[in-house]
Amino acid sequence: MAGIIKKQILKHLSRFTKNLSPDKINLSTLKGEGELKNLELDEEVLQNMLDLPTWLAISKVFCNKASIRIPWTKLKTQPICLSLDKVIMEMSTCEEPRAPNGPSPIATASGQSEYGFAEKVVEGITVSVNSIVIRIGAKAFNASFELSQLRIYSVNAQWEHGDLRFTRIQDPQRGEVLTFKEINWQMIRIEADATQSSHLEIMCAPVRLITNQSKIRVTLKRRLKDCNVIATKLVLILDDLLWVLTDSQLKAMVQYAKSLSEAIEKSTEQRKSMAPEPTQSSTVTSSAQHVKTPQAANAPDLSDAIVKLFNDFDVKETSHHLVISHLDLHICDDIHAKEKESNRRVSGGAMQLSFTQLTIDYYPYHKAGDSCSHWMYFSDATKTKNGWANELLHEFECNVEMLKQAMKDRNLGSPPKSPTHASPQHTQTEKDSTLKGTPKTPSVLPQPSKAKLMSSSVVVRLADFNIYQVSTAEQCRSSPKSMISCNKKSLYLPQEMSAIYIEFTEYYYPDGKDFPIPSPNLYSQLNALQFTVDERSILWLNQFLLDLKQSLNQFMAVYKLNDSSKSDEHVDIRVDGLMLKFVIPSEVKAGCHQDQPHTVSIQSSEMIATNTRHCPNCRHSDLEALCQDFKECDFFSKTYTRFPKSCDSFNLLHPIFQRHAHEQDTKMHEVYKGNIIPKLNKNTLKTSAATDVWAVYFSQFWIDYEGMKSGKGRPVSFVDAFPLSIWICQPTRYAELQKEFQTCDQVTLNTSQSESSDLAGRMKRKKLLKEYYSTESEPLTNGGQRPSSDTFLRFSSSSSDADVHVLVRVHKHVSMQINHYQYLLLLFIHESLVLLSDTLRRDVEAVIGSPASQTSVCVGILLRSAELALLLHPVNPTSALRSPASESGSPLLPDFLPAENGGFLSSKRKQGGSGIHRIRNATLNHMSDNRSMSVDLSHAPLKDPLLFKSASDTNLQKGTSFLDYLSDKHLGKISEDESSGLSHKSGSGEMTSEGSHTKDVASTDSDSVLNYRDGSTRLSLDDDGNHNPPSNPVTGKGIDAIHSIFRAEDFLPEAASLSENPESSKEEAPPARAPKSQTSLSAKSKERCPPSPAPLSVSYKNMKRSASQVSLDTLSLDSMVLEEQAESDGSDSHVLLGKAMKRNSNTSCQSPAESVNTSANTQTCGEASPEAVSTNSEGTQENRDDLMSVVVFRITGVNGEIDIRGEDTEVCLQVNQVTPSQLGNVSLRHYLGNRPVGSDQKAIIHPKSSPEISLRFESGPGAVVHSLLAEKNGFLQCHIENFTTEFLTSSLLNIQHFLEDETVATVMPMKIQVSNTKINLKDDSPRGSTVSLQPSPVTVHIDRLVVERSDDGSFHIRDSHLFNTGTDFKDGASSDSVVRTRGMCDVRMHSSVTQATQTSPEVPLPSQSANFLDITREQLMEENECLRQRLAQAKMELAEAHSARDELLHQMKRMGL
């Protein structure tokens, strides 16, 4: 009996062992136990059973002892137990792949019989191994794996021990069965050491890894009829891992992996070429299966339950998975490598990498285009990737169809080919290569082929991770800070969302046929990642990686390994980013200011980076529109060589961009042009990475400050969010590729008309469509077709081409704000980054031993409009200049007029804004036709009166003539539109008045008086309130009277000063506002309340008044306008004024809280009556804390280019127009809350033929031609041309304090050229005496001026060499400045005046004669004298008007009003 059983055992075991004889078997038949000793297993059989890769071969397997226990009576429910004591396996690597594995002996155990009882018993065997030692010998290293307490056993679908009958799920209808196995071990020890050799002593650092308990879960799906395995699912689960690696161990690991990479790659290609055809699950049940399962017909419910259970655990395709719950990896420097410490900037450093829930999935046999919903960790990221990959496949299918058609056309036009010329395999695959779409054209030589396009995918998921900053022994004991981390929790993102998702897919045909295949694709998703710049960590990593790369190069040279990397092969790449954050910190100083930020964070909401054109905002049409925007700017033209660019500047708009935008760089385009012979081979449609054009799109991109104590942990905005597009190409690599292409493939470049007729027609239709939709755009091509690609194929890199060309396009208006402490932080960060960059460069040179490769980069930036707000320290209100009248109190006016007047003026502003003469210095010009009076504020940005009003806005000091006129029933409606203008309409006449921007709020000389002249309709006033002799009111059908003049502060803009109408806002010019009296008022949004008109303001000086007079003068123009239709005499007007005083507190369009803040403003200026604002002191105290003096620079038409040539850097910047606005003291909270954010300002403010500001900055060795110091500190050149602006001296002083640095600034050599520039300066500094006169505004007109700064820091100021002598220029400028201090006289010989202060001809150009200069100087002197006379006369009349006004006020007081 025992002999018979031994023979049966030998029959089955002989397939696995060698030299097995019956005497080696000890068997106890009744007990069911047996024992074998010194077993030598068959290597080839084990290779087939384990399905080892062909780059690995088993050379020997030995087992010292094996025992078996068979439960004879319970074979259906209990497994056979096989125990092995110690197994030793020796393996070796193969440089060339060995023969493929044969069929598994388990599958053939029963002679290819059906799945029966014997197969179930064998399948359920439990194997236990005390110790397994695997030794692997490779060319460059030896490795060993030691596993202890290994167990292999069957489990149920929930991975639990149980009855063997529940360890399988059998579906007779499908003809398939699922079995579940689990393999676990107590410990695994991995060790790898370099091959012992005399010349490899430096690479002998052993690599060791010890893991704790782990397990593998295996799910097998077999066919019932032949027991063949259809699909396998293998999951390797590792618990927490801690691995410490020194730099030498990491080098060894990289070297070992590199030595195996070539063999692994060859083996992978072999596996793909011999991959099995994917099999479909059988839906038809065989008769034999029905015989075996007779109960299925009687139990339909049970059958349905089995089918459902089978579907729940079905393995649709083979896959392998690695799951690591937590991995801590520590990389540190070698402690014993003392010879390297002297070369390291950071010695003894260590970095910790912590990964949570790391999963790696591998799907080797996935049918291309099929659904992935059955994958193990299917998510939204997988769904997005599938949609993108399907678009790529669809494009590939279309290209294959066009390629087939091109081959047919070529064959028809050529002599008949031999039958063997056209591959039957290729012709048939016209049907098979397409995964989805329309039916294909029948092939000429059809032949069956079962090959389908397959894909191999690797998916990496990382739920959370932290890469900490480098730490050293010198640092104090503290928890390390994160350098790269995930912010899912702080952003409240779903926990199931992966921090990093990466999926790489390759395509192949199972039979290895030579047919076009798509390019591999890589999809990556980054969610809520934060990168923090740490100087020590970057320096340490840089040296670490450089050392690693250098040792790897040495290793490859020793073993003569080829660099088989496919870096030049194109890979379709897409990277999606969600809530990415880049943080640049600074050193925290003790005792810093509460407004001092500690970090700058650069963030984006959504980001897409791709080299394909199948992503939103990254398509060919988007690039075409962007190229058109750049081409519309002459600055980016190749022929533009004027300053700030030069003849050596790169050609930013490279032809690669234009060819790619019009899809002229594809393989199919070259086929149609005749440059490539159409062939159906593997690489026909593949391209090189050198042809890639990258697109990066940020839907929202913004920059914040963080870490301020005053911010209470909240970020403060620096640059408001805006969309950003970036396009990148590589001309140098493309040129090298074209050279290789021409060398390898000498193909004629002549294009046949027949081959390109379809393409030319398509492009012609595209051009006609573009011309139809954009008639004003510049033609993109010459003639009726696109530029010929033949010429571009012969393209070679020139000096005007950089290695990398970058186009940066900002699509919206950019708004920025910065205060002094934030400015200091930016200076510190700039210095730190420059120092870090220089240190990295020197480290690279030290490790490599030679200078780093010189890379050239060209970056172009296009920005339509921007706004920079300087948040300066608030001006002390008590230091503001006050007139004697203001010392005794000033009357108040309500902040708002009726809202309905705003629409009236807005329409009038649009009608008359462009046709009136532009006046810059408070010159009120009433036209002689008695129908129109206009003062243009075309340079004044928009103002929302709801947000910014000073006390002077409510300060109305009325003269006698004004009160007399109030009694007239012809008081017109007054309103203020977005440009702070005044429109008056009465009868058939209309009046449009736009105030000046140059008046000081507290100025005692800035008074305006209403005047009337007999027989004339012209009224002229200067900045000091001086006027022509008064006359009677104008009569007739024109204007009834002029009843007020706006003071400068009435026209000043608010925070953002952006109009609701972008076109009108673009036509505004710079105002000047005294910040000392500007306070912040709360305001409602424009949607809640329309813009209110500004109150009229007429101020006088040298007139002291009592408190009662001040109270009397506190009038509401809202009331006056509402009752302007009332028929009354002069006495009735006094009654109306008295009623208006009572209505001062309840202004329309204002909430109670806003009213408090509004009226509280007047107290801070020291001009308001205490009685008028006594109830509002609390609101004033609240607003005082966040007051800032704001100066806004509105920038229009920004064109920039950055050229980098190795260490040389050139920055060229061109600004079309700069418009400063001085808002004075405003509430920071209200300013930030009410300014428009991200508004698209497409209109350009007064397009100019030449930009106002051109700037060029150079640094590096190439800048030595300008100055020796320029190599280090840089050299700045700036040209300012045709620039006109206005500034208050307080604003200039405040900006000076803003720019002050805490340290001594480095000397930067520079050269500044100023030409045809006018700056109006208003001195609003406090006077030493209250009776001193306010200085008159001074206009500085600079025709030609050069300012140079040398290396020693000294400045040199000189005039242009175009002037023969400096005397004429000096005299001319002097007289011109005198004249421009008054904006009064109307020079009748020059009717077409275009500037407010221009009362004489412009200073002649240098090309004009000297005689003309003399004549102009004489005219200026005459005008100066005329202005002086007018000024004296106006002062006398002003004093008389003050006296009359004071008398009238006393009369009103006696009347009890």
Swiss-Prot record:
Repressor keyword on record: no
Chain segments carrying region Disordered: 267-295, 409-449, 975-1038, 1056-1099, 1145-1183
One Gene Ontology term of the molecular function aspect: lipid transfer activity
UniProt-listed Pfam families: BLTP3A_B (PF24917)
Keywords for this protein: Coiled coil, Cytoplasm, Endosome, Phosphoprotein
GO biological process: early endosome to Golgi transport; intermembrane lipid transfer
Domain Chorein N-terminal: from-to ranges: 3-94
Assigned GO CC terms: cytosol; early endosome
Residues where Phosphoserine is found: 414, 418, 774, 934, 1008
Keyword field contains Cytoplasm: yes
InterPro entries assigned: BLTP3A/B
Transmembrane portions of the chain: none
Sections of the chain in a coiled coil: 1410-1455
Subcellular location as annotated: Cytoplasm, Cytosol; Early endosome
Biased composition (Polar residues): 278-295, 980-995, 1145-1180
Function of the protein: Tube-forming lipid transport protein which mediates the transfer of lipids between membranes at organelle contact sites. Required for retrograde traffic of vesicle clusters in the early endocytic pathway to the Golgi complex.
Subunit composition and interactions: Homodimer (via N-terminus). Associates with the Golgi-associated retrograde protein (GARP) complex. Interacts with GARP complex component VPS52. Interacts (via C-terminal coiled-coil domain) with STX6.
Protein name according to UniProt: Bridge-like lipid transfer protein family member 3B
Upper classification of the organism: Eukaryota, Metazoa, Chordata, Craniata, Vertebrata
Annotated gene: Bltp3b
